[in-house]
From Swiss-Prot:
Its biological purpose: Low-potential electron donor to a number of redox enzymes.
Alphabetically ordered keywords of this record: Electron transport, Flavoprotein, FMN, Transport
Cofactors demanded by this protein: FMN
Sequence ranges assigned to domain Flavodoxin-like in this UniProt record: 1-136
PANTHER family: ANAEROBIC NITRIC OXIDE REDUCTASE FLAVORUBREDOXIN (PTHR43717:SF1)
Source organism phylogeny: Bacteria, Bacillati, Bacillota, Clostridia, Eubacteriales
Record-given protein name: Flavodoxin
PROSITE patterns: FLAVODOXIN, FLAVODOXIN_LIKE
GO molecular function: electron transfer activity; FMN binding; oxidoreductase activity, acting on NAD(P)H
Source species: Clostridium beijerinckii (Clostridium MP)
InterPro entries (UniProt xref): Flav_short (IPR010087), Flavodoxin/NO_synth (IPR008254), Flavodoxin_CS (IPR001226), Flavoprotein-like_sf (IPR029039)
Family: Belongs to the flavodoxin family.
Amino acid sequence: MKIVYWSGTGNTEKMAELIAKGIIESGKDVNTINVSDVNIDELLNEDILILGCSAMGDEVLEESEFEPFIEEISTKISGKKVALFGSYGWGDGKWMRDFEERMNGYGCVVVETPLIVQNEPDEAEQDCIEFGKKIANI
């Protein structure tokens, strides 16, 4: 499994690492990959795409790296299972609802309720680990 993420402050990266911990605890292999380092062809061979991005600005996906990545894969992911996660500093999670809606629009199957965490995942560490375990057992 591969977890692809973008993180501005490190919070979403921490979430990715905790989700990976849950996957590993379930007996599966996983790699966490910053979106700037992802090999899209390899990623598309995965059964489940695990994608994470923090909210930016007016609750949107990060525009210089993550948004172009999503645009690039958008025509290649119909029928794929996806799991979404990310952190935010303010707002109510609109960016994640929009992200989930887009993935559904591309023909993806969102396999778990997207996981969002306000600020650092300290208090939500176990939630992140459990999210990883759920994904590993799909």
